[in-house]
């Protein structure tokens, strides 16, 4: 993790997201290693992937580097919104709801308990149209948002980028890059420079499918 953090900072990335969830000791060591490697001027987001208990979350965010996080994404299991709310009210760090708010009904529960400061991945609720409904509801209740793409092809990432650029609620560093992908299905895959994607100026989503790749990679 430390070596990757140093490389990304050298490439110009100003915000790093640290994926956690092995165990509490490993997570704390990982956070410290990334912070030391990245330096004090780099913003950190941490994502425990629902693996922390309420007690662990409060302890981790009480560590010296804890208040330094931009936000902590979904620290506890998605169904335990009450614990998420208690963490949010006790923590000096912003709390983001991800898996806990995949649907309108789930978001309502998060809003009722004031369990988050922001939403992550509103597109997971069913596309751009549904995401706008989610964002409108979040806006009424004073929440912000961010978007995340970690395994999408260029088509899905392009949709996410349009949402990111057009919503006033999305005020955080964009969490998107190409991870784990060996191939794409568009003629010119999206590119990120220093963690930032270029603007899409072509019609529609701004990307054009490669018919031959779609045919070859399709599953029947």
Positions of the model-derived regions?
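Shared catalytic-loop signature of beta/alpha-barrel
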Residues: 62, 68-71, 79-96, 101-196
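Metal-dependent enolase-superfamily TIM-barrel catalytic cores that perform enediolate-based chemistry
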Residues: 1-91
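Electropositive phosphate-/nucleotide-binding environments in soluble metabolic enzymes
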Residues: 2, 28, 54, 78-81, ...
């Amino acid at each position: 993790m430390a070596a990757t953090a140093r490389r990304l900072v050298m490439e110009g990335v100003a915000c790093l997201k640290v994926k956690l969830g092995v165990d509490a000791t490993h997570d704390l060591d990982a956070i410290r290693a990334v912070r030391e490697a990245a330096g004090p001027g780099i913003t950190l987001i941490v994502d425990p992937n629902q693996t922390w208990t309420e007690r662990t979350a409060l302890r981790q965010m009480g560590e010296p580097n804890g208040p330094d996080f931009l936000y902590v994404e979904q620290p506890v299991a998605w169904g335990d919104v009450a614990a998420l709310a208690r963490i949010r009210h006790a923590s000096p760090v912003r709390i983001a709801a991800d898996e806990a708010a995949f649907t309108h009904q789930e978001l309502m529960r998060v809003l009722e308990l004031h369990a988050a400061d922001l939403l992550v991945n509103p597109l997971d609720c069913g596309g751009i149209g549904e995401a706008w409904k989610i964002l409108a509801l979040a806006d009424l209740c004073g929440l912000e948002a961010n978007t995340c793409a970690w395994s999408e092809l260029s088509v899905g990432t392009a949709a996410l980028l349009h949402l990111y650029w057009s919503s006033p609620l999305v005020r955080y560093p964009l969490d998107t890059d190409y991870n784990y992908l060996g191939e794409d299905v568009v003629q010119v895959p999206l590119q990120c420079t220093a963690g930032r994607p270029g603007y899409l100026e072509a019609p529609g989503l701004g990307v054009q499918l490669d018919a031959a790749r779609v045919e070859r990679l399709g599953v029947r």
